[in-house]
């Protein structure tokens, strides 16, 4: 029985290896990329911006902007990163079946994901020279609210993330904060106006609050 189990494990490892290799060759069509260890798997980076993840025999591509809605329409699920005591859902979508069955439809999505990740990295690199009120959707009033909640600057805001910033503000102001602030913080984090957030993205944010 053990021998059969070992053989099955070997076969699975070979299949996973072939899948990864085919995906890497697929992504090469869009330009050069680097590989680094991430989340127990391999992260794919273009110009130091991560746009894809390969782990446990599954392929994931980064969401963001209008790409989220396309992933939702195609039935792709978000990557769940299992930590010691919690499960964190991050904005990477499982494209394994899509890659196997409809690779042509995936190519433009991966290209857009690469571009989005580069733009966000550039945005985050420029954060050192920005005030909270300089971020999209933020003004002096919101800057004061966020600082009162214990988030002193842009660097901290982006590191903590929109959901947890909202939680802090909501707690500080007695749990009676307009949910629009969550959209505004999410837009500020992504570098877009909050009205551009798609409904699936809003629902995903709400589920984390």
Curated annotation (Swiss-Prot):
Name this protein carries in UniProt: DNA transformation protein TfoX1
GO biological process assignments: DNA import into cell involved in transformation; establishment of competence for transformation
PANTHER family attached to this UniProt entry: PROTEIN SXY (PTHR36121:SF1)
Induction remark: By chitin oligosaccharides, but not with polymeric chitin or chitin monomers.
Result of knocking out the encoding gene: Defective in DNA transformation.
Organism: Aliivibrio fischeri (strain ATCC 700601 / ES114)
Primary role: Required for DNA transformation jointly with TfoY (tfoX2).
Keywords for the protein's UniProt record, in alphabetical order: Competence
Stated family: Belongs to the Sxy/TfoX family.
Alphabetical list of SUPFAM superfamilies matching this protein: YgaC/TfoX-N like
InterPro entries assigned: TfoX-like, TfoX-like_gammaprotbact, TfoX_C, TfoX_N
